[in-house]
Curated annotation (Swiss-Prot):
Family classification: Belongs to the UvrC family.
HAMAP family, sorted: UvrC
A Gene Ontology term for the protein's cellular component: cytoplasm
Molecular function (Gene Ontology), one example: excinuclease ABC activity
Organism field: Mycobacterium sp. (strain JLS)
This protein's UniProt keywords: Cytoplasm, DNA damage, DNA excision, DNA repair, Excision nuclease, SOS response
Protein role: The UvrABC repair system catalyzes the recognition and processing of DNA lesions. UvrC both incises the 5' and 3' sides of the lesion. The N-terminal half is responsible for the 3' incision and the C-terminal half is responsible for the 5' incision.
Localisation: Cytoplasm
Protein name: UvrABC system protein C
């Protein structure tokens, strides 16, 4: 482990201006990013007294091998640069406020001719308007089910919409008037879009206008003696009011605000946010984070600053991704940064943080501590939620952590390892009768899957022509994986643009193969060949769940049988089963691509779009084979030269061109079609 004194900057070399700094490990990876009003004061605090640092900060300083800094003009610039660097490098020692679950949102696809309402998780898309997040998907479905009585918008997928359009008959929702059935032409595209826009206005908080419009229409219908329509409008008004009743009014002045509260202990913190729009609570989110314990920083003020920077920076990016100049433009109720942000305390750089938030919003943002009245009462409610979330997390983690610790300790004791296997890697081979032979490698750290480090391998040397050798495949994958590790170790400067290793950053403590003695010995032979002696190798056989060790091991030639109730065996089974699942998924993908391949794939210059157009036009490859050149060129984008190449690939003999002039004309015609 590096000695901090070896990379400590020389006295007087650090500037006193504000700036942003980053620590790098011996491989050049960025492991921590921070900012400071005075770079000299802050960086010196890391090296003055290591024993006085928080454990996490001390570990960071001991892991690092280099520190760099960038001087900026203002603290607002430092705030923005720190956010950008954390986003770019994802340093392992920085707090990252990631949701404790993937919260669903209600997406309205305004970029489609007939917009659709749907539950959605994932990155924001241009031309789509989002509402939420909601705590559960069923809450979205319940809201949509209630409001489609008043706003009968489309909720079906593209396939269902197309099918009912073809049979000219609406679905059940169309028959019960919960969909305006644009698929069969009951309403025009413009009428349906207006229904969807009214739906969006209601969710955005513009409720009074919509209710008044319905009341006016109900009165007019009653005056015209159209009592059936008046009764329906009365029921619609009741449905809207029931929806409003579910959103309790917390601020009588119709305020837009986010209320943020924390609960923390020495190691972790829980944060809860209530999103209030138009005076009503529209959503709630929660996070659990590990505290950094950065020197010279107050606890809660630091949490407030880091959370607001990361959360609203991310939200502004999502908002711009989903923004569109047309129908999906942001309004007051959907702007990711509200007019007010209520927090438990103001950070030291509150003025700079407020200025940055105002820039994100496009207008003034108020950062305040609630003191009395409704805002204080709601803040206390949010704080109770944060305390409850932290208590539940600690209770759950205590059970999970105890089990994982017991599992790792069991494996260490059973195999006689010097340390607990904090990083476990497992490989598995998958094929069907020697075809599409692939391998998977999965990684578990601290007993939990680390999916960002998972890898697929297509077997090159140990398979082919319908043959497969599992033992040779294990050896090939082991060699490829650890050759990369040796390459990274010998060339530590070869990093990606983000400062990360291009492949694997760290070797495993334990390498698991799916199989028995032959597979284990094959993997061990590769490690011996490469000169790697600090990685333990075992095999886990499915029969009796035996744990095999390499020949010549001090543990003896016989397999080890772990107790059936052993936490260590349970962890090894989960690792092995995850590797098998990952390999099967990749194998099925490769096999599906191979089985769906056709003779058209070999036609030079014929891409997927035009292949699909040909098959769609003729109905099948067999019918395409019977077509003439003239019939094929009737398909948009297909010229004479391409048509001849298609027929040649399908085995249809072609007559040679009559002369060079004709050939030139054909080529010219084909070029005109492609460029057109």
């Amino acid at each position: 482990m590096p000695d901090p004194s070896t990379y400590r900057p020389a006295p007087g070399s650090i500037p006193v201006e504000p700036g942003v700094y980053r620590f790098r490990d011996p491989h050049g990876r960025v492991i921590y990013v921070g900012k400071a009003k005075s770079l000299r004061s802050r960086l010196n605090s890391y090296f003055a007294d290591l024993s006085g640092l928080a454990p996490r900060t001390r570990q960071m300083v001991m892991t690092a091998a280099k520190v760099e800094w960038t001087v900026v003009n203002t603290e607002v610039e430092a705030l923005q640069l720190e956010y950008n660097w954390i986003k770019e490098f994802d340093p392992r020692f920085n707090i990252r406020y990631r949701d404790d679950k993937s919260y669903p949102v209600l997406a309205v696809t305004l970029n489609e001719e007939f917009p659709r309402l749907k539950v959605y998780r994932g990155p924001r898309k241009k031309g789509v308007r989002y509402f939420g997040p909601y705590s559960h998907a069923w809450a979205i479905r319940e809201t949509v089910d209630l409001l489609t009585r008043v706003f009968p918008a489309r909720t079906c997928s593209a396939g269902v919409f197309k099918r009912h359009n073809q049979i000219d008959r609406p679905c059940l929702l169309g028959y019960i008037d919960k969909c305006s059935a644009p698929c069969v032409g009951r309403v025009s595209a413009e009428q349906h879009r207006q229904i969807v826009l009214d739906f969006c206005d209601f969710l955005a908080g513009k409720t009074d206008r919509l209710v008044r419009d319905l009341e006016r229409k109900m009165t007019a219908a009653a005056e015209d003696l159209d009592f059936e329509r008046a009764a329906r409008l009365r029921d619609d008004i009741g449905a809207l009011r029931r929806a409003l009743e579910k959103q309790t009014v917390v601020f009588g002045d119709g305020t837009d605000a986010d209320v943020v509260a924390f609960a923390d202990d020495d190691l972790e913190a829980a944060v809860q946010v209530f999103h209030v729009r138009g005076g009503r609570v529209r959503g709630q989110r929660g996070w659990i984070v590990e505290k950094s314990g950065e020197p010279g920083e107050s606890g809660e003020g630091q949490l407030v600053e880091q959370f607001l920077t990361q959360f609203y920076g991310d939200q502004a990016e999502l908002g711009s991704a989903g923004d569109n100049a047309g129908d999906s433009g942001q309004d007051e109720a959907t702007n990711p940064v509200p007019r007010q942000v209520l927090v438990p305390c103001l950070p030291d750089n509150a003025d700079e943080l407020t200025e940055w938030l105002s820039q994100l919003r496009g207008s003034r943002v108020a950062l305040r501590v609630p003191q009395r009245g409704d805002k204080k009462a709601l803040f206390e409610t949010v704080q109770r939620n944060a305390k409850e979330a932290l208590a539940q997390h600690k209770l759950k983690r205590a059970g999970d952590f105890t089990a994982r610790t017991a599992a790792l300790q069991s494996i260490q004791d059973t195999l006689g390892l010097a340390d607990a296997p904090l990083r476990i890697e497992c490989i598995d081979i998958s094929h069907v009768q020697g075809t599409d032979v692939v391998a998977s490698l999965v990684v578990f750290e601290d007993g939990l899957p680390r999916k960002s480090d998972y890898r697929h391998y297509a077997i090159r040397e140990a398979a082919g022509d319908g043959r497969s050798d599992d033992v040779a495949s294990i050896a090939e994958v082991t060699r490829r994986r650890f050759y990369r590790h040796l390459h990274d170790t010998q060339h530590p400067t070869e990093l990606s643009a983000e400062g990360k290793s291009r492949k694997f950053a760290y070797p495993p403590n334990l390498f698991v193969v799916d199989g028995g003695a032959p597979q284990v010995n094959a993997a061990q032979a590769v490690l011996d060949e490469l000169g790697i002696s600090d990685v333990a190798v075992i095999g886990l056989a499915k029969r009796l769940e035996e744990v095999w060790v390499p020949s010549g091991s001090d543990l003896g030639p016989e397999p080890i049988i772990l107790p059936r109730n052993s936490e260590g065996l349970y962890l090894l089974q989960r690792v092995r089963d995850e590797a098998h699942r990952f390999a099967i998924t990749y194998h099925r993908s490769k096999r599906s691509k191979r089985m769906t391949a056709s003779a058209l794939d070999s036609v030079r210059g014929l891409g997927e779009h035009r292949r699909k157009a040909l098959v769609t036009h003729f109905g099948s490859v067999a019918r395409l084979k019977e077509a003439s050149v003239e019939e094929i060129t009737a398909v948009p984008g297909i010229g004479v030269t391409t048509a001849r190449a298609v027929l040649e690939a399908l085995g249809v003999p072609q007559a040679a061109p009559a002369d060079s002039g004709t050939a030139a004309a054909v080529i010219d015609d084909d070029q005109r079609r492609v460029t057109g």
